[in-house]
Structures are given as C-alpha cells and as structure tokens.
C-alpha cells in the first residue's frame, strides 16, 4: 500500500479562531474519527484544542 493511504497528512486548525494550523500525520486504522489535540497557539499565547480539518 502507498504511504499516503495509511497515514495521510492532516491539517489541525485552532478552535480559538486565530487561523493557526499544525500539520501532522494520522493513522486511519487507529483513529478513524477526526483528531482533536490540545496544542499551543502562539497567537493567543495559550493551549487550545486543535481539530482536524477536511
């Protein structure tokens, strides 16, 4: 199988509404739903939830 089918690149967008994004890889077999990670948003200078964007 090609590399991009199992672990595609996904964009994580800040829920604080700043437009700041992280890019990461996701394993579709282990995480079929949308990812939600708590990461640092430098625009608001605090940790917020980042949700997977499709």
Curated annotation (Swiss-Prot):
Any single Gene Ontology cellular-component annotation: cytosolic large ribosomal subunit
Keywords: Ribonucleoprotein, Ribosomal protein
Pfam families cross-referenced by the UniProt entry: Ribosomal_L33
Any one GO MF annotation of this record: structural constituent of ribosome
Keyword Ribosomal protein: yes
Classification via InterPro entries: Ribosomal_bL33 (IPR001705), Ribosomal_bL33_CS (IPR018264), Ribosomal_bL33_sf (IPR038584), Ribosomal_zn-bd (IPR011332)
Biological processes annotated in GO: translation
Gene3D superfamilies per the UniProt record, alphabetical: Ribosomal protein L33
Presence of the UniProt keyword Ribonucleoprotein in the record: yes
Family: Belongs to the bacterial ribosomal protein bL33 family.
PANTHER family assigned to the protein according to its UniProt record, in alphabetical order: 54S RIBOSOMAL PROTEIN L39, MITOCHONDRIAL, LARGE RIBOSOMAL SUBUNIT PROTEIN BL33M
Protein's recorded name: Large ribosomal subunit protein bL33B
Organism field: Mycobacterium avium (strain 104)
């Amino acid at each position: 199988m090609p590399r991009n089918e199992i672990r595609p690149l996904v964009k994580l967008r800040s829920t604080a509404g700043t437009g700041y994004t992280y890019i990461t890889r996701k394993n579709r077999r282990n995480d079929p739903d949308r990812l939600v990670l708590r990461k640092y948003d430098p625009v608001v200078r605090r940790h917020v939830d980042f949700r997977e964007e499709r």
